[in-house]
């Protein structure tokens, strides 16, 4: 039965965390890649594209529920040393949300140099062992293509939040809140190219749909990507982000038609 809590609110996210904790061992990207845990596993990743304060609110709620997850920050847009430190101290993983191919207009040599320098800025604050590409939907460059020419392991990185799972995902189901839905229909680059999940437009639209699907035992291994700005703390904020998501989804639809 659907909850009356407003979808894509922090209260709804707390409900989702409760369902996840009931059915899975929840882990960070680093924990999954380094420990290779067995059983019912849920990886929870946050891409902090905007609204740093909301990321901290989420991290605090997760901590109160005994959950540790991964938070990936963009440089310099969401790079706030005080917030990174606070979230790290709550027990969460901090990662680098890189977008260097987009920033350098596809110049690989400049991009890898920029990657190294931005990574060092993060490491002045806390250890960084995993990275995650930013989708940059308005750019023609796919940031993860950087690793077709270079090896992130040479920078002391054990894994990339897409590529490492595409190489060995088994029965891992990948779902993202991109576009204010769990269906995946608004994702351009936020996809796990070899995962059996990647959303299901017919059954997974709302967070209530997702929670019901989880409760049915539909996936042994689950990988969720969450964007903190999408989960509002009040009705005014919810209306603003709902309108922004509507505009972004429309823009992506135009881009798909343009490139088709």
Question: What annotation goes with each model-predicted range?
Answer:
Residues 74-77, 99-102:
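Short, acidic/turn-prone active-site loops that include or flank metal/cofactor-
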Residues 1-45, 49-70, 84-90, 101, ...:
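Terminal accessory/targeting
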